[in-house]
């Protein structure tokens, strides 16, 4: 299967074999967030569009990397399970190619990791990366190490840095795409009820309105994607505790997201993960977990982002949830997640459209 995917990637790239513009950065292993106020780079005029699908990574290796276990260590990191899903799915779909076969055509893959293990060249482990060198959008990361054992230790230690770096880049790529192809109906209804702006998935075609609540859905039997937005008064910092979130979410969903029979409604399962983050330079509570329908065999993953609308002293919650029992859910929920970060609160409506929506992981330059 991976050979087929690689062959498709090569065919797609061959039609776009042009030389891109460089945007080089040196890096060490310490991560930091790039400010949301900085403008996102636009596609250079003569740079081709990158090939490959979202969350696909091409790893370029030397033959010895297979023998020492260095490649396997990196592969295991990249394919670690996505958090918050109802079934095991890899963080990334990994293809591999030896350096001898890393042709110009393959230079246009959207995410590339090059393994550089050589004691004659490197004295310590380090990340290096470049953006949009051969195509757009694209990240080419070099992982340097003096030997295989140091490489393996470095990659394991920086597991979260690697995953978050590429994941956030993909989320921002999707957010940029949504700003060009968004759902005008959702945007209008959200503005009318909440005074907020958002770029949501074009496929959302069904709507339900409640009190301080909107629900948009693709209304599919499978691969069903849903977006909800609701608000409630902001009290104090205790508003962002786990217990408060679950109680508030369950009360809102009970009133607005029913099951097929009376007495059935959406609930939050105990499997919930909380993360404090920043969106547009302000605090955001990001929650991932699973939902189900009370007394009914139906459920799936959700992700929500809660932010404080200081102008109106309320909490605005945007959430995406998926129902797709017969298929993988990673790309579905991540498309929805990307749309959540495009939310503009009333005091943010003058933000430029080309700013970062979710702070990227940026590895410190030397």
Task: Write out the residue ranges for each language-model feature.
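The feature marks either
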Residues: 30-146, 160-163
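Secretory pathway targeting signatures of secreted, lumenal, and periplasmic proteins
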Residues: 31-46, 51-52, 58-65, 69, ...
């Amino acid at each position: 299967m991976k050979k087929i995917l690689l062959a498709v990637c090569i065919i797609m790239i061959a039609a776009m074999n042009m030389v891109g513009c460089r945007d080089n950065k040196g890096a060490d292993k310490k991560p930091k967030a790039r400010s949301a106020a900085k403008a996102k780079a636009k596609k250079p005029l003569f740079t081709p569009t990158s090939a490959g699908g979202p969350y696909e990574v091409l790893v370029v290796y030397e033959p010895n990397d297979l023998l020492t276990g260095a490649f396997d260590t990196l592969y295991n990191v990249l394919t670690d399970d996505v958090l918050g899903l109802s079934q095991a799915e890899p963080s990334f779909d990994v293809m591999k190619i030896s350096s001898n076969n890393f042709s110009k055509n393959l230079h246009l893959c959207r995410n590339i990791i090059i393994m550089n293990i050589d004691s004659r060249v490197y004295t310590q482990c380090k990340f290096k990366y470049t953006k949009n060198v051969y195509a757009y959008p694209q990240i080419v990361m070099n992982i340097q190490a003096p030997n295989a054992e140091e490489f393996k230790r470095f990659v394991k230690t920086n597991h979260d840095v690697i995953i978050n770096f590429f994941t956030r880049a993909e989320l921002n790529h999707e957010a940029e795409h949504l700003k060009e192809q968004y759902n005008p109906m959702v945007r209008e209804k959200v503005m009318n009820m909440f005074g907020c702006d958002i770029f949501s998935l074009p496929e959302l075609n069904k709507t339900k309105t409640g009190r301080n609540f909107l629900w948009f859905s693709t209304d599919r039997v499978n691969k069903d994607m849903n977006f909800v937005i609701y608000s409630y008064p902001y009290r104090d910092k205790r508003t962002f505790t786990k217990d408060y979130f679950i109680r508030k979410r369950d009360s809102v969903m009970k009133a607005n997201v029913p099951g097929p029979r009376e007495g059935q409604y959406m609930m939050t399962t105990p499997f919930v993960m909380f993360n404090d983050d920043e969106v547009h330079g302000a605090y955001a509570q990001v929650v991932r977990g699973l939902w189900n329908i009370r007394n009914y065999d139906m459920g799936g993953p959700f992700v929500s982002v809660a932010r404080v609308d200081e102008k109106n002293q309320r909490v605005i919650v945007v959430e995406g949830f998926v129902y797709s029992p017969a298929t993988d859910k990673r790309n579905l929920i991540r498309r929805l997640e990307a749309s959540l970060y495009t939310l503009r609160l009333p005091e943010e409506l003058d933000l430029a459209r080309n700013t970062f929506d979710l702070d990227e992981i940026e590895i410190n330059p030397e």
